[in-house]
């Protein structure tokens, strides 16, 4: 749970502020994000519709199938159960047409407007209206909002954290299970949850919470397993076998002429090292660290050296970062938010350079070259800046949170 000083700050803010403004701004921002990319360029949403549902037959996404009029066999979707269910159900609202993939993208993005509004609501309840608004207008978050369906997993994860803070443990476990069944990333939250219960000498409660979450997860997944186990398991097999991919630390190093040898082995070493450092942070802190704060650092460590850096990862990091920033005093918040803004700009620049680099290579030597063109070196430098600033922001946040805990402890002692 949150510290008493944190709870008092939030309660005082919530008495004075309503969430309406944050929700409205979030929804307006999400609508503008649709107009920024109204055809869904570089979005999995339109791509997966074309690969799996374009013939209007609405075939089960966790099956090997062939579209009408095609001879190419399509593999199951490489997403967890609930994401596949969402993309399948939404396909029923779109009639086959020449540009049906655009209609499908816009329908899905329109639903995301509502989800983004609810996300802002929970962020406000867990931090403050100002911080929720800052998240809602974060440029890199909006730029990546409709790349795929991650918002469907992020919202229940944040809801689970909120319910945990409210001591509604069973509901929290259920929504965390929903999040894991939608994306699987939130599984990393088990680390800060386990440490939280361990440091509070409540190991039995911790085992029950994690066990209950996994039971809920299993209950959500069993129907999919029974329908087509191979189709259901395809995502997990695909993720395990996935090679080092685009926009990762490994690719950026290669682009800059410093390839990392034995990348597959180094991938595991770096991840274990990063998670080990987070574990040290969680266990050696002067006070028990909240689930919200701990989940940010664990998620950051998990994403930092991922095999592939997908652009929507910034939504996970930004939403959790906002919750962690909420633990700081107003003065410390102001300082760290400046760095948060710089990090967001670097994320946006990196994402833009990534896509322009793809277009530059695709249309090189044609009559319609990309404009502007982004060279491999420019893309690599943008990636280096992005990764560096993300690490700097995270270290600065950890430093400020530790300093805040010490300040709160000394204030309490003096009082």
Which residue ranges define each predicted feature?
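Multi-pass membrane glycosyltransferase architecture that uses lipid-linked
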Residues: 2-234, 266-415
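Periplasmic/ER-lumenal interhelical loops and adjacent helix-loop junctions
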Residues: 224-269
């Amino acid at each position: 749970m949150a510290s008493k000083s944190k709870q008092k700050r939030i309660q005082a803010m919530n008495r004075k502020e309503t969430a309406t403004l944050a929700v409205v701004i979030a929804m307006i921002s999400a609508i503008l994000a649709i107009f920024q990319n109204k055809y869904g360029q570089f979005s999995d949403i339109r791509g997966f519709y074309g690969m799996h549902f374009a013939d209007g037959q609405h075939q089960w996404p966790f099956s090997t199938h062939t579209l009408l009029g095609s001879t190419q066999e399509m593999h199951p979707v490489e997403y967890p159960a609930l994401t596949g269910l969402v993309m399948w159900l939404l396909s029923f609202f779109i009639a086959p047409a020449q540009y049906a993939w655009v209609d499908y993208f816009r329908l899905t993005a329109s639903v995301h407007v509502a989800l983004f509004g609810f996300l802002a609501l929970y962020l406000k309840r867990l931090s403050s209206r100002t911080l929720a608004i800052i998240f809602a207008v974060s440029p890199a978050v909006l730029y990546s909002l409709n790349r795929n369906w991650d918002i469907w997993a992020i919202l229940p994860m944040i809801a689970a954290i909120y319910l945990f803070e409210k001591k509604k443990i069973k509901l929290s476990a259920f929504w965390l299970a929903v999040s894991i069944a939608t994306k699987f990333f939130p599984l990393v939250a088990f680390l800060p949850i386990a440490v939280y219960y361990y440091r509070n000498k409540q190991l039995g409660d911790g085992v029950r919470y994690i066990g209950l979450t996994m039971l809920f997860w299993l209950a959500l997944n069993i129907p999919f397993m029974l329908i087509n186990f191979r189709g259901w398991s395809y995502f997990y097999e695909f993720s395990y076998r996935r090679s080092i991919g685009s926009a990762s630390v490994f690719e950026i190093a290669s682009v800059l002429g410093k390839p990392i040898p034995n990348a597959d082995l180094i991938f595991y070493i770096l991840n274990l090292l990063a998670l080990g450092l987070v574990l040290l942070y969680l266990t050696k802190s002067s006070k028990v660290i909240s689930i919200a704060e701990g989940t940010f650092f664990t998620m950051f460590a998990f994403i930092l050296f991922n095999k592939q850096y997908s652009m929507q990862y910034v939504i996970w990091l930004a939403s959790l970062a906002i919750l962690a920033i909420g633990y700081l005093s107003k003065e410390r918040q102001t300082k760290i938010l400046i760095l948060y803004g710089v990090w967001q700009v670097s994320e946006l620049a990196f994402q833009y350079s990534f896509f322009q680099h793809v277009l530059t290579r695709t249309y090189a030597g044609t009559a319609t070259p990309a404009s502007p063109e982004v060279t491999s070196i420019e893309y690599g430098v943008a990636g280096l800046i992005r990764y560096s600033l993300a690490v700097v922001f995270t270290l600065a946040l950890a430093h400020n949170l530790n300093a805040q805990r010490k300040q709160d402890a000394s204030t309490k002692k003096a009082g």
